[in-house]
Amino acid sequence: MHMNIIVVKNYEEASQKAFEIIKSLVIEKPDANLGLATGSTPIRLYELMCEDHRVNKTSYKDVNTFNLDEYYGLKHDHPQSYYHFMHEHLFKHIDIKKENVHIPIGEGHIEEDCKRYNQLLSNNKRDIQLLGLGSNGHIGFNEPGTSFDTSTHYIALKESTIKDNAALFFNGDLDAVPKSAITMGIHNIMESKHILLIACGKRKAEAVKGMIEGEVTEELPASILQRHPHVTVIIDEEAASLLTK
């Protein structure tokens, strides 16, 4: 197994560590392909990237970004769309070019859009793919039971994911949460050169244990990362609390 597991004290330290890895890539390779994630986990990392850009002038002008997923049925300008999230938390605060930002389209012709995104991904292998981890072990919106062979696809979200997202972003309103999404498939994720996964908090401990110590199974999508040649897992003490090794 090629997992480099880094256990830190808390979320702040996890974000700092992830930031150091991303910054050193961007300095070493100014036209890097970055795979980005949304949700609550990367928010502090993006703040650190914005602060660093402002203070140290680290440039993203030649960087290309590829987001994991987008809710289906939300327009770009919807305040809960991942397009909006990325602009608010990162893109509008750094010098990235608009044409270098790639996010799945959450409306319109599903098949065509998935095909186009797959083409884009196979032409642009990510130097680093950032991932969070769902409490049910999902990566991107690849829910338990998703085939490891999938590329970008439309998916109906599991109830546990809808509940998690309602609590985090929709003031607990289950009805307001989109019930489906377009997501990079597990095959696309596994094509990345380096995978950087961050997981913090007790809620993630069970999924972390399964991902690192469990068997590789489609019932826990993140377990496939055991088969990737270069994975860095950054977890805080709470998320690491069930690990036995």
Region spans (language model):
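A glycine-rich beta-strand to alpha-helix segment
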Residues: 32, 40-41, 45, 120-147
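Class I SAM-dependent methyltransferase SAM-binding "motif I" and its flanking Rossmann-like core
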Residues: 140-186
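Short beta-strand segments
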Residues: 35-39, 67, 104, 130-133, ...
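Glycine-rich N-terminal segment of FAD-binding domains in flavoprotein oxidoreductases
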Residues: 28-54
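Ligand-binding beta-strand-loop-alpha-helix segment within the catalytic cores
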Residues: 1-2, 58-129
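ATP/nucleoside-binding phosphotransfer catalytic cores, i.e., glycine-rich phosphate-binding loops
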Residues: 184-187, 191-245
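A glycine- and small-aliphatic-rich helix-loop capping segment at beta-alpha/alpha-beta transitions
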Residues: 48-59, 82, 144-153, 214-216
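N-terminal glycine-/serine-/threonine-rich phosphate-binding loop
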Residues: 1-34
